Amino acid sequence: MAWNGIPVVDGDGHVMEDWDALLQYMPEPYIKSGRFKGRIFPPLDHLHSASLFQLVPGAFRQVGPEGWLEFMEDVGIERAVLYTTGGLAFGKVITLEFAVDVARAWNNWFADTYLKKSPRFQGLALIPLQEPQEAVKELRRAVTELGFCGAMLPSTGFKGHLGSKEYWPVYDEANRLACCIGVHGGAHEGLGMDT
């Protein structure tokens, strides 16, 4: 689990969400609506869906915590910082209440499925930056109650740039909690590739 005596940490691992299991963490009206079969987040972008590159068979499959632990053993990784995959498009969620509910559901699902399974997993929570005060609350809950090491912010989709003053309370709370904030690319609209 070390290379030349240095522990190996995967700082950008991605879980493939189990959508059916995740849906069970959403408030009852979402479950009953039947609208969220197979996916909760918006699609990343057309750049990903229209690409003709070939994937290795089995790539991007949902392996769960057992598959992750097996992989980590096979390649000698001591710990992994795990991110959402579907949630890379979380910035595109426009309904504030839905953003809050999805963040809470994803964080609860991930904590139950991964963080409680092994201390070798570290997680970056989703926080609803669409409503900064709610993001502060969810960051605090994710770190202090669920055991996340910080939060992930999608790089695109929000109304202001990530340095906007409206988001400063989130960064102040992260500083107070001594936790990390990771900004992760994934959705590419508005970055010059679509003009």
What name fits each language-model region?
Residues 1-195:
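Helix-coil boundary/capping segments in enzymes
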